[in-house]
Amino acid sequence: MKTAEKTKWDILYDPQKKSLFARLEEFVINVYFSDVFTKAILSVSNIKNGKIFEPGSGSGMTCGKFAEKGFDVTCMDLSENALQKTKSVFKHMDLDGKFTLGDLFHTPIKDEQFNVVFNQGVMEHFRLANLDPSKGVKEMLRVLKNNGTLVILVPAYFSPLFFVYQFFKVFNLLEKYWPYTNQDFLHKHELFEMMEKAGCKNIVVKRLWSSFFFSMIGYCKKE
């Protein structure tokens, strides 16, 4: 990953530089959406125990929910600040986890290690940065065990968040208030094609109603 991209995420997770909107977003994710995403992933994977990996774990709250349920959790992020945030979350919740500094496109993990590999709020940032997100999905598949479940959650096109983003964009307020200036909102067919290009089979893509349709979920089993 480009050094500029790494620096951008380190700034985002620097508590001294975090914008008001970024703080609000993190609060909402921590309070509500991490629980929604955890339930959705458990539902589509039908997993009761095992190893879970989140490349692009951010603040680590969703991984924390899985650790609370007894799963063996590995969190990976490009940003050292994000990993420090995750470690503090796990320490505060008295949870065990593994933490890896790494790039989704060159994951420093051996093949076929996990029962579930997921991320949320990650794959929408690559196309506008001239990166092919399917290469990241391919890496996620590589570290997933056979018959394991791959899950990707992204902001949906024409979701409530999409219209808020467009408002900020029209009035040139993204740089000042929005945490991500290169955020993408995906159509169903775009997420499907991203996963298909990476080699996924029997893909399911749908809007996640429990997120108030803010998010879209794509998932498949590794065959």
Question: Predicted segment positions?
Answer:
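Conserved N-terminal segment of class I S-adenosyl-L-methionine
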Residues: M1-F105, V116, Q120, V137, ...
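A short hydrophobic/small-residue beta-strand
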Residues: V73, L150-V151
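Conserved class I S-adenosyl-L-methionine
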Residues: V151-F171
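Acceptor-substrate binding/catalytic loop of class I
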Residues: L173-H189
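Short conserved loop adjoining the S-adenosyl-L-methionine
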Residues: H106-D111
